[in-house]
Curated annotation (Swiss-Prot):
Belongs to the PEPCase type 2 family. It catalyses: oxaloacetate + phosphate = phosphoenolpyruvate + hydrogencarbonate. Catalyzes the irreversible beta-carboxylation of phosphoenolpyruvate (PEP) to form oxaloacetate (OAA), a four-carbon dicarboxylic acid source for the tricarboxylic acid cycle. GO terms for biological process: carbon fixation; oxaloacetate metabolic process; tricarboxylic acid cycle. It holds the Pfam family PEPcase_2. It comes from Halobacterium salinarum (strain ATCC 700922 / JCM 11081 / NRC-1). Transmembrane segments: none annotated. The gene is ppcA. Its EC number is 4.1.1.31. One of its GO terms (molecular function) is magnesium ion binding. Keywords: Carbon dioxide fixation, Lyase, Magnesium. Homotetramer. This is Phosphoenolpyruvate carboxylase. Its cofactor is Mg(2+). It is an enzyme of class 4 (lyase).
Amino acid sequence: MVDVPRLMSTQHPDNATLPFFTAGDVIEGEDEIQEAYYVYSHLGCDEQMWDFEGKEGDEYAVKKLLSRYDEFFADHQLGTDVRLTVRGPNPDVEGSEAKILLEILESIPRSFDAARRFAGEYGLETTAPIFEVIVPMVTDADQLNAVHEYYERFVTGKADEAVWDGRTVEEWVGEFDPASITVIPLIEEREAMLAADDIVREYATAHDQDAVRVFLARSDPALNYGCLAADLINKVALQRLYEMSEATGVDVHPILGAGSAPFRGNLTPERAAATADAYSEVETFTVQSAFKYDYPVETVRDGVATLRDADLGAPPFPIDEARALAVIDRTADAYADQVDAIAGTVNRLSSYVPDRRARKLHVGLFGYAREVGENALPRAIGYTASLYAVGCPPTLLGAHALTDDDAAFVREAFPAYFDHLADAARYFNPRCTDVLDLDDDTLAAAVERVDVTPNSEHRAATDDAIDALQRGDDDALRSAIRRGARERQFLG
């Protein structure tokens, strides 16, 4: 495997501030072509996720990038110097969108053709602009094997098939390159994450891979099990992946899908060094929209440079798995009980959260996860934004279940959790229980574990949001939600 990218820019709609290149309130279509160029050329990201999962994606992205920004890509070759990595739906989970995955796979050789023409014009060696596909919500290796095999058998494999009178498909429409792709599992559900080592081993063995990139989610596990549980699940998964790699010789290159909100990973430009230290075994971090657009551009570039230059890919700090799993169980159960009590209000609030990307309905894992019941909730960003809107950072939920012994263990195993808790607690408004069916004492128990000064501007915004919700003033509620998001520098 060639050098692994450090910074994967994504299209997550967690930004409070709109970027300069979009005319409306939603980033979509041609905006995302310009965004990809911007993150490569101005921010220093070396990878852009091109997302078809839960949103519309442009299958002609490669052709448009190369034709519009030819001078840049003549010096920074797409596929080697910078990457475009597509994410499609998982047919086993999102059946109504399943065939979109096939369309994505069929488009890869067409993108290669565009890159071949571009390379010829500029005297460059042709390289595949797209050669990896991210599959979300993976629960077993069969889902990866199916994608890998489909591409080789039915996309490139049809080249030698005769279409008429002995003429082959390749003779008719040209070569099909690249000959093969690699599949990146995006693993989001607890049991699958804890079995990530088995999933990667089985996939690598089936296709004789000597290296695999594996994408561990941070937002959806938090939505499903709570903030602390999400980090501990990731830490156990990373330890197991490392042990598998040592035992088999398969190189594992972890990606962590962290956002700016503490609940979703607490990865901001200002916390880049702290995140790299907390997850030094990770090799690629996601750079989501709030990271890119809610800070001054020089601050963003500094954060990108910090991650790019960090000493990543280190062996994990050993964690007591049995102890970690016990804390996960205890806090996740407490978190689920609180979510049960507030789900209705969260859904109501989410309708007032501004959209930042053109997206479709997302199936998600929350409704399928027994650990959290059968509540239908918004996506993680909308959920997080809804709770922040009324001064209840979701990082606080479930934290009251920590015993003093648990807290001592967490300070040793993952001390960054208390930074997450502190960064969230400054936005806590005790009045949130006026509109959320939560116990004051349990929230206070979480807040009291850290020493913070409340953010007065955010407190005022959440006071206004609570008042507007109670009196049914929709416009005032929307305005207060936006004001609070700008103050904390992320939407959700």
